[in-house]
Amino acid sequence: MELKLLLLSLGFLFISCSSCMPGDNNGEENGSENGSNTDPGDSETEFEYEWDKFPVPVSAGTGMKWELQSQSDDFNYTADSNNKGNFEKKWTDYYHANWSGPAPTIWQRDHISVSDGCLRIETSRPDDVKIVKVTSGDKEKMMPGTYTGCVTSKTRVVYPVYVEAYAKIANSTMASDVWMLSPDDTQEIDIIEAYGSDRVVGDDGHKFYGPDRIHLSHHVFIRDPFQDYQPTDPGSWYKDVNGTIWRNDFHRVGVYWKDPFNLEYYVDGKMVRRVSGKNIIDPNDFTKGTGLSKEMDIIINMEDQSWRAISG
């Protein structure tokens, strides 16, 4: 997976997350942060940041403006997998806790690098790979681990904020992910969760969503005893009218976390999903009436998810 990241906050916070190509933008409603109204199609225009060429798709509202946040990163620098330099000013090359990922995933720090204007997450399975136990429901299987990467922001974000990634998902059965998670792992907002492979049926007959879908969702959890809520309506698996195969190019995918009970999702500058109110944000009252209210880390990773791996 390759990506860039943009973060804006209202009056505010805004993150731009992008990948290995020109990507995100930031600014006020009609232009860049300083209020200019540049033409994205004008090749003569010079931009301070790659995301300046795109208007922010969300109105800041009367008397408000979007402010670019320092966690935003267009990845226009080089960071070797074993010597990350500038990358470490904003990111940690691992998960936000001491966890190596959902088996058979094993996150490795040296599978993260930055080059050619993109954050790059690689995947490998060497001959001497560790064998791990994978469990999904009542199924259990021993299988080779999958080495890949995960990064976590050093700055947390909270509403009102617009976070946008300019990303190209991997051609893989693995998940390409951009998401936000509270430090206690009880509140989560998924910006991108997508599977780029054409393989949509497992060896056990389990059917998967394919490369024409992007999962736009959120979770609230109780950790003990474990309970997990997320919306299951068809709109959470976005498919556009053209049947776009999302792995074929870079796309901008963002979420406007307006407040604890309102989320808006944007794809290539167009709002494609809105979830609003307790009945869809937290119908089981796991948050005790507070909704999605906690500060969150931004996490970018790939995962060989247990349920999919065990299906074969």
Task: Set out the residue ranges of the language-model regions.
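Bacterial N-terminal signal peptides
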Residues: L8-S16
